[in-house]
Amino acid sequence: MRPSQTALWLGLVLSLALLAVGWASARPPIYVSSWAVRVTKGYQEAERLARKFGFVNLGQIFPDDQYFHLRHRGVAQQSLTPHWGHRLRLKKEPKVRWFEQQTLRRRVKRSLVVPTDPWFSKQWYMNKEIEQDLNILKVWNQGLTGRGVVVSILDDGIEKDHPDLWANYDPLASYDFNDYDPDPQPRYTPNDENRHGTRCAGEVSATANNGFCGAGVAFNARIGGVRMLDGAITDIVEAQSLSLQPQHIHIYSASWGPEDDGRTVDGPGLLTQEAFRRGVTKGRQGLGTLFIWASGNGGLHYDNCNCDGYTNSIHTLSVGSTTRQGRVPWYSEACASTFTTTFSSGVVTDPQIVTTDLHHQCTDKHTGTSASAPLAAGMIALALEANPLLTWRDLQHLVVRASRPAQLQAEDWRINGVGRQVSHHYGYGLLDAGLLVDLARVWLPTKPQKKCTIRVVHTPTPILPRMLVPKNVTVCCDGSRRRLIRSLEHVQVQLSLSYSRRGDLEIFLTSPMGTRSTLVAIRPLDISGQGYNNWIFMSTHYWDEDPQGLWTLGLENKGYYYNTGTLYYCTLLLYGTAEDMTARPQTPQESHCPLSIVAELCLISSKQWWWLYSHTQQPVTKGQDSCHPPTTPARQLDQRLHCLFPAPHAGSASEPLQGLSPLAAILAISLGPWCCPC
């Protein structure tokens, strides 16, 4: 064959290969026989629709009367096309506010399969075998073991009768959303593919001092399991799993997500986003549910966890991995949304994580970021035992402060605008359980979350090989010009753009205080030409920085090809609080409060009533000048106390406790004449 013909054939083969990769990265949706429907008249209307159109009403998706799960036995269980007939019928119904035929969602467990190595009998990551471990023994020595905290593992089930799990097993924190029954027992297969959830559960709450296997980080916490990954995964299944018993479960731990293949951009559907929102606003009696998420195992494919809409949600706490030697594991994904890091393993000769396994066994072969997230969930359970009144945002602030660079090795460690070291590989560093609990005991409640939305680009703009888009932020104020945000928390960039080869485009953001955060780095396997459609990137690297000043969005072609594209719109979303969080002590301070449970509460005495101040009603600030003028004898209280607000209508003996939660009212009556500085 002549050289010209050879080159032609090679080019054709290469083109076909690239097309195959492109098709694989843009799979068509697979529609199933389930619909999510939102109706205005609740259960009766859902029943009427089901009878009229031949659906089976499988009940509410959330614990209210709006969203329902309908299934049609006459529709194919899997199809490449939606059912247009039912779409048109539901669209004509005036009481149907929204509906969506469900599609299968590809979700992979974030564990790693490695060759069998000799058994490691010691849990090196928490028994002081290494100098800088997770510092869990310090917390155990204080008598904290997770008692009173409930954790649920969202995965492929949990072996509830395991000798190291049955004593802590909580059926109220468990369910099977694959078969819709209360039993989360995993399905057994010849290769034990459904061992993942049982392994994660043992890391959190394996029973201690029973002569079997090892001990969980929070070995007296109650543990549940949700079976949801061993079957058809839809938006309904994910939302129901994340909404299970939100007033009973404190922490959900998830070690799964979209495919870590270096070319997928995917995230939660509408129902799952709603489940996250409801969890943090209504869960735990309004304190907010904790969603702990594994950051991902796509490092081998140069994946980036900011292309995963679960790990980069402001409602989840994303956890990365490091090895015993403090190195970046080969599977680890670097991204700006990671908060913190715990241990796992790297190469096959590295020691791994000891935990429970199927068939009433133990294993020392648990690894990947799947192993890291449950360790963090257990440590947060210890912090919640120390201070049950922490909100979901309080815990995120505490994790930032309780993570330390320690011995973690990476070339991208940087100091942000408030002096903290941060890395795309590790977030703020290795989570220290002892420091986390010490801070939790004396933590004062964070002021309410504020949000600023700033439009950066609103007209289509061609993307240059290297483009910088500046935006001066001066409007994070309310109508009275009071600053809404003084200290940042999460920062998001929401944008839509087209690009001829998406994986070649690097996007970064620089804050007014000079912190540069890479929102997405080059992904060589992502050859998609679809760009990003209304995608949200998130960074934790600006935590506690001042948002006022010049922000700069950068876009740069990092590939070997000439690429073209258009930035259609871009919005900067700033979340934070009106308090200057840098003024708070960065290390635990001695508490003068006699009961740690009221570390977040101010109690004052007036006319024989104990008034209780809760952070959900008024902000806590220092100094009398910052307070609303008190109208009762609270004026005469010692000025060394922070702001103390009397209950309204103090003249009535029946009214002072109105508006308080049941827990707050009980505390107000029973704690006696203690007054704590807030």
Swiss-Prot record:
GO terms for cellular component: acrosomal membrane; acrosomal vesicle; Golgi membrane; trans-Golgi network. N-glycosylated. Synthesized in the endoplasmic reticulum as a zymogen, is matured by autocatalytic cleavage between the prodomain and the catalytic domain. Proprotein convertase involved in the processing of hormone and other protein precursors at sites comprised of pairs of basic amino acid residues. In males, important for ADAM2 processing as well as other acrosomal proteins with roles in fertilization and critical for normal fertilization events such as sperm capacitation, acrosome reaction and binding of sperm to zona pellucida. Plays also a role in female fertility, involved in the regulation of trophoblast migration and placental development, may be through the proteolytical processing and activation of proteins such as IGF2. Residues 1-26 form the signal peptide. Glycans are attached at N472. Belongs to the peptidase S8 family. Furin subfamily. Coiled coil: none annotated. Keywords: Cleavage on pair of basic residues, Cytoplasmic vesicle, Glycoprotein, Hydrolase, Membrane, Protease, Serine protease, Signal, Zymogen. Residues 123-437 form the Peptidase S8 domain. One of its GO terms (molecular function) is serine-type endopeptidase activity. This is Proprotein convertase subtilisin/kexin type 4. Gene3D superfamilies: Galactose-binding domain-like (2.60.120.260), Peptidase S8, pro-domain (3.30.70.850), Peptidase S8/S53 domain (3.40.50.200). The proPCSK4 form interacts with HSPA5; the interaction takes place at the endoplasmic reticulum. It is found in: Cytoplasmic vesicle, Secretory vesicle, Acrosome membrane. CDD domains: Peptidases_S8_Protein_convertases_Kexins_Furin-like (cd04059). The gene is Pcsk4. Residues 446-580 form the P/Homo B domain. It is an enzyme of class 3 (hydrolase). Its EC number is 3.4.21.-. Pfam families: P_proprotein, Peptidase_S8, S8_pro-domain. Expressed abundantly in the testis. High levels seen in germ cells but not in Leydig, Sertoli or peritubular cells. Expressed in the pachytene spermatocytes and the round spermatids but not in the elongating spermatids. May be expressed within hormonally stimulated ovaries.
